[in-house]
A protein has these predicted regions:
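Conserved ABC ATPase "signature" region
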Residues: 6, 69, 117-135
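A short, flexible loop at the N-terminus of ABC-type nucleotide-binding domains that lies
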Residues: 1-7, 12-24
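Short coil-to-helix segment of the ABC ATPase nucleotide-binding domain corresponding to the Q-loop/switch region
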Residues: 99-108
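The feature captures the beta-strand-to-loop junction immediately N-terminal to the Walker
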Residues: 38-40
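ABC ATPase NBD coupling module
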Residues: 70-87, 116
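Short beta-strand immediately N-terminal to the Walker A/P-loop
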Residues: 35-36, 88
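Helix-to-loop junction immediately C-terminal to a conserved catalytic motif
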Residues: 53
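Conserved ABC transporter NBD signature motif
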Residues: 61-72
């Protein structure tokens, strides 16, 4: 098995904070493994995910994903990396209550500048996959 993710001695220091957000964190994830991140409020989970996803950069240390040192990516490369390699599942989701279910599903695709035809096709595929096609025209609640 090859190493998919290598986190080596990551530290994240925030200005005016008494302790680091991350303090010399190191671990590896091998291809095919799953990793769960748990901890108390304020323990650094969100900070870790932010640096792993290139939303933030560590103060020191290195992160390699597929052999690439991700904190050295340009903003454009980092955006492409997030789009093509990462997925997020949020604990608490947010729907725009002024939009229909269909429009809420379409928001990320619209932000990616997909064509209207592509958006409609993908939204319908997802709606059918999750059994919510009959709910698409309803306002989100």
């Amino acid at each position: 098995m090859s190493t998919l993710l290598e986190v080596k001695d990551i530290t994240k220091i925030y200005p005016n904070q008494p302790k680091p957000g991350l303090d010399h964190v190191s671990f590896e994830v091998m291809q095919g493994e799953f990793l769960g991140i748990m901890g108390a409020s304020g323990s650094g989970k969100t900070t870790l995910l932010n640096v792993l996803s290139t939303i933030d950069i560590p103060t020191s240390g290195s992160i390699r994903m597929g052999g690439k040192k991700i904190q050295e990516l340009s903003q454009t490369q980092a955006a492409d990396f997030r789009k093509n390699n990462l997925g997020f599942i949020f604990q608490e989701y947010f729907l725009l209550d002024s939009l229909t279910v269909q429009e809420n599903i379409a928001v990320p695709l619209t932000l990616l500048h997909e064509s209207a035809k592509t958006i409609d096709k993908k939204v319908m595929e997802l709606a059918e996959l999750f059994g919510i096609a009959s709910q698409l025209k309803k306002i989100s609640q």
